Amino acid sequence: MLRWLKADLHVHTVLSPCAELEMGPRAIVAAAAANGIGLLGITDHNAWANVPAVAALAAREGIAVLPGMEVQTREEVHVLCFFPDLASLAVVGEEIRRHLPRIENRPEVFGDQVIVDAEENILGFENTLLLNSVELTLEEVQDITRRAGGLFIPAHVDRPAFSLLANLGVVPPALEPDALEISGRVTPEEVKSLFPALTGYSLITSSDAHRLSDLATPRATWFYVAAPTLAEVVLALAGLEGRKVVIVSSLENKPHDLPGRL
C-alpha cells in the first residue's frame, strides 16, 4: 500500500567539519522524530563513516536512512549520492576518498571531523580535510554512483555557491540527474521562474542541516511510496507506478490531495 513519507535527504553529522558538535546520531534521530521525518539522508562531505551509526539508531525509532554522502566535484559543485545499502556506499566512499587531496585537517580552523558510534562515543577523528573538491568531474561522480546502483542529485542548485547553476550556469547535457535539490527558501514555482531550464526535472528540498534547529524547515519533501527504500524513491522521482514526490509547506501535516509530480 502506498503512503506519504516525509523526508529530509541532506543532513550532516559531526564528521563534517562545518557541522556543529551537537550533530551526533542520537540528537539527529531525536530531532528527525520531533519533526515527523520518516526518511533521512545522511550526507557528510566526501565521507560516510557516521552513516552506519545513524542508520542503526534510526531503525530502532522506525526512521529509515538512505546511505549517502555529499561529494564536492572538481567543478566545486555539491552533489548528493545515495546507495542501496551500506556495502555499496562503502565501496564508492573509498573511491571518493582516493580522489580527495591529502591535505590535513586543521580543527582549530575548519572544525573537528568526529567519527562516532550509535551511542555517540567517539571512535576517532578523520585527519584528511573533507572540505576540498575531489579530483573527479560531475560526470565521473555520476557514473561511479550509477554503477553502484545509486541515486545522483545535485545539491541546493539555486544557491550562489557550490551549486550547479552558480558554477556552471546550466545543467550539462551529459548530466542526467535523478532529481535536483532546491533550498527551503524558495518554492518550486519560484525556482522554475528564476531558472526556466529546471522545468521538467523532479525537485526535492532538504534542510542541509549543520545544526539540530536546521531540521525544522519551512518546506518539506514528501514521497508517496510503498516503503522507505532507495528503489521506491527512484520510482517516486520518476513518477512511476503511482509513486510521486511533492514539496509542501511544513505547516501542512500531509500533502493529501496535492497534485503528484512537480
Stretches found by the model and what they are:
Residues I42-H45, L129:
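Short coil/turn segments at secondary-structure boundaries
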Residues F83-E126, V170:
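Active-site gating loops and adjacent loop-to-helix segments of metal-dependent hydrolytic enzymes
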Residues H10-V11, I37, E120-G124:
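Generic signal for short, ordered secondary-structure residues
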Residues D112-R147:
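Alpha-helix-centered segments that form part of catalytic cores
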Residues M1-L9, P17-A31, N35-I37, W48-V91, ...:
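Charged catalytic cores and adjacent phosphate/nucleic-acid-binding surfaces used
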Residues T13-V14, L40-T43:
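Ser/Thr-glycine-rich phosphate-binding loops at phosphate-binding pockets of nucleotides
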